[in-house]
Curated annotation (Swiss-Prot):
The active site is at residue 201. Its main location: membrane. It is found in: Cell membrane. Keywords: Cell membrane, Glycosyltransferase, Membrane, Transferase, Transmembrane, Transmembrane helix. Involved in the assembly of a N-linked pentasaccharide that decorates the S-layer glycoprotein and flagellins. Catalyzes the addition of the mannose found at position 5 of the pentasaccharide to its own distinct dolichol phosphate carrier. The chain crosses the membrane at residues 260-280, 285-305, 381-401, 427-447, 496-518, 532-552, 556-576, 587-607. It comes from the Archaea. It is a multi-pass membrane protein. This is Glycosyltransferase AglD. Disruption phenotype: Mutants exhibit defective or limited motility. Belongs to the glycosyltransferase 2 family. Its EC number is 2.4.1.-. GO terms for biological process: protein N-linked glycosylation; S-layer organization.
Amino acid sequence: MGRPTERRPAAATAAGVEVSVVLPAYNEARTIENTVRVTVETLESFLPADAFEVIVAEDGCDDETPEIADRLAAEDDRIRHYHSDDRLGRGGALERAFEAARGDTLVYFDTDLATDMRHLEELVERVRSGEYDAATGSRWMPDRVADRPRKRGVPSRAYNGLVRLFLRSDLRDHQCGFKAFSREAFEALRDDVEDNHWFWDTEMLVRAQRAGFRVAEFPVDWEPKGDTKVDLVRDILGMGSQILRTWWQLTVRPRITRRVTIVAGLLLTVLALALMTLYIDPSEVISVLGDADPALVAAAAVIYVVSWPLRGIRYREILRELGYREKAGFLTGAIFISQTGNLVFPARAGDAVRAYVVKARRNIPYPSGFASLAVERVFDLLTIAGLAGVVLVGLAATGGLDDIATVLATGVSGGSVDVSADDVRTAAYVATGVGVVAILGVLGIALSARADRNVVRAFVGRFSSDSYVELVAGVIEQFVSDLQAVAGNRAAFGRVGLTSLAIWTVDVVTAVVVLLALGVDIDPVVLVGVSFFAVSVGNLAKVLPLSPGGVGLYEIAFTVFMAALAPVTPAAALAAAVLDHAVKNAVTIVGGVGSMLSLNVSLTTAVEESAEVRDREHELADSK
């Protein structure tokens, strides 16, 4: 990216400058000269001639705006041209220009002069006088005159309402391009403001209020210029996501301590298990568990251990395609630690731990760590969805689909168990939806890897011409390119795919041995087939990270389909699901503790530092 540079006469000086007015400009060749001249004339009407400067913050224009700005700067020492080769975004351009500004009162307004310039003196003096630290014009206050067409007014009211609701702002209008800040307020807030685009000034105003700065809002006369329509990328993906991001940072995250996170996760787990008692008598389950064969339970644990080196090998292959070569043993330990984190913390917070471990111990960059994890998750979903699909084909060939149709229509009942048809259908729909999305996603990525044109940027560009397109498209492209490195390479796809198949086959075999440990006596072919289906659907059902380790979510899905498709009582099916999950979680915890000791990693520290890393990565992404 080209660095912003200033184009101005060498003779210009900073002496006496009190007010700096920034005009953010992108392809404004038709209007910029008139805007600059009107601005200078208006400032001269209430300020000494040498007390102000006007900065044209030209943001990667591809028309004649740079040449016009250069000429204006050459004609008047009070006019400066601040140039960027690439698009910084409106917020980025403003921030860079304010950094270079000489005045202690920093002002900006839109170059279309939609706000009546007779209000400029009031805007400047509100801050210059020291009465306020920030000031903004408002099109929604009483006594204002704003000819806002419905297509602008409705979205604007909705946006400002959301900002007031979620971010607890006292202002009525955050979007009016007519604002001023004191140098002190700008310097205090600039490092906290993360957005570089259209949300920048909203975030400045919100954070200014939170920090205790005095913010003035006054009515202005405003007349729209040009034709503006709703921009999907800017208004929804951009502005909407930034409201949620700021709300999370200011309101939610300060309340989420490590203790609160653990307690919330445990409560979710207990709640999920408690809800299952509405369908199944716990005493019946405990009775079945008490009859389990200890030797076979131990055998199930040993079998499950085999899947972990396979996970390390798969992760090695993924990282190799991204350009990093590591030993499978170390990577197995990193996976153990991250999966242990997922058992302790909700919302799959343990996933971020792996990126921390490989960065701290092998210096693999955080973006690559997160990308490799995403690749692994996609292949997991693809594999278990494929396994479930294969079993469905087998059921169709043998007439077993009738059993699924029956359970979808009537639910599952027997003994003390009574699961409604609606609940069964919900589980089936969620699992099917996740599976279909995984398969279509991988197919799309594999096909796009062979395409010459930039599909992502072309697709996003259909919805917006705003600078947010660069940010959104860049994030998506980085993620997709890492997936393409594996999915688009036949050899890599085959290696990672076969390893994933082996991992989940071991997972299913573990469940089969657990069922045998509980004395389940059914045809081996049926046992294996139904186990593949129940385990696959159970894991698809726990994709949503609502409880640590998916406890409760996996059990109920496994129970429903095992009881529906095999001659197994619902109580025995639930007991198998609970024991199967317990065995796997026990192996994970033992391996995780051992790996933490061998790699000298604190789990809680890793979770906290990885969360901080994710925040820094978002900041870096916004600054690019």
